[in-house]
Swiss-Prot record:
Name recorded for this polypeptide: dITP/XTP pyrophosphatase
Organism: Treponema pallidum (strain Nichols)
Purpose: Pyrophosphatase that catalyzes the hydrolysis of nucleoside triphosphates to their monophosphate derivatives, with a high preference for the non-canonical purine nucleotides XTP (xanthosine triphosphate), dITP (deoxyinosine triphosphate) and ITP. Seems to function as a house-cleaning enzyme that removes non-canonical purine nucleotides from the nucleotide pool, thus preventing their incorporation into DNA/RNA and avoiding chromosomal lesions.
Binding site for Mg(2+): 82
EC number per UniProt: 3.6.1.66
Co-factor requirement: Mg(2+)
One GO process term, biological-process aspect: nucleotide metabolic process
Class of the enzyme per the UniProt entry, highest EC level: hydrolase
Residues that hold substrate according to the record: 22-27, 83, 165-168, 188, 193-194
Gene Ontology CC annotations of this record: cytosol
Organism lineage: Bacteria, Pseudomonadati, Spirochaetota, Spirochaetia, Spirochaetales
HAMAP family named in the record: Non_canon_purine_NTPase (MF_01405)
Key word rRNA processing present: no
């Protein structure tokens, strides 16, 4: 199953408001589409001034550092990631320093960083590279949920495409014949390193929440059986949401609607 499909079907991941430990609007758009069952919030949109130094030696260290820094401020679920481009011929550089690559030479824009990297790779035959992403979800007292995604590709000789951000215009996917910057966000979310990391994260989160989901399904089944007691399908509570209805009542009606559907299946069997 493709990463984006699993994430959309992961119904056991209960709704959360999650703060993204970044002020990058492109990352926000990607994670929002990868976790459609949750609301992803940027700190700046909530009036929070957030900054993390990102001075770790690994992707995980940087991601955890960002998650811890924002959680200390919001005390709510926090999603953080650190990613970078690792070029085989450069011994994995720029790696964890991808966002600051060339800063010592006065390079501070994505375009300038890509140009510097292409100059470093001029004349080299081995242009294999990887996009790596490590994402962490901090929920408080429970252990961190961690997901890692790797996407293999080839470094181009020139920039192509206008979508995406960072090094996307020079990262070519051989099996598609296009760079990340030439893919729509829906296409990118099927193959990207960030999508794969989000998939691992969702799987871990689903396993953590499985006991709660099973309790809910058991309650649902008991309600359905009560409706079919004696071989007769009994009506449940009305499910249509009415004006002025409280959120709790709406949830109860939604539960009974699901229970009735389950009861019909039992009755037919």
């Amino acid at each position: 199953m493709r990463a984006v499909d699993f994430l959309r079907r992961a119904t056991v991941c209960w709704y959360m408001r999650i703060y993204l430990a970044s002020n990058n609007a492109h990352k926000h758009a990607e994670f929002s589409s990868l976790f459609p069952m949750h609301t992803i919030l940027l700190p700046k949109d909530e009036g929070i001034d957030f900054f993390s130094p990102e001075d770790g030696s690994t992707f995980f260290a940087n991601a955890r550092q960002k998650a811890d820094a924002l959680y200390d401020v919001v005390h709510a679920p926090v999603l953080a990631d650190d990613s970078g481009l690792c070029v085989d011929a450069l011994d994995g550089d720029p790696g964890v320093h991808s966002a600051r690559f060339g800063a010592q030479h006065g390079v501070h824009t994505d375009t300038a960083r890509m140009q510097l990297l292409l100059e470093r790779m001029h004349g080299r035959q081995d242009r294999a590279c990887s996009f790596v992403c490590v994402a962490v979800l901090k929920l408080g007292s429970v252990p961190l949920c961690v997901g890692r995604g790797v996407c293999r590709g080839v470094l181009t000789t020139e920039m192509s495409g206008v979508e995406g951000f960072g090094y996307d215009p020079i990262f070519l996917l051989p099996h598609l014949g296009r760079t990340f910057a030439q893919l729509s966000i829906e296409e990118k979310n099927r193959v990207s390193h960030r999508a794969l990391a989000a998939l691992r994260l969702a799987q871990v989160l689903a396993m953590m929440q499985l006991p709660r989901a099973l309790r809910y399904e058991l309650k649902l089944l008991r309600g359905a059986r009560r409706m079919t007691r004696g071989g007769v399908l009994r009506p449940g509570a009305p499910c249509a949401q009415r004006k002025g209805q409280t959120a709790q009542t709406a949830r109860r009606h939604k539960f009974y609607a699901r229970a009735r559907r389950c009861a019909r299946r039992i009755h037919r069997a």
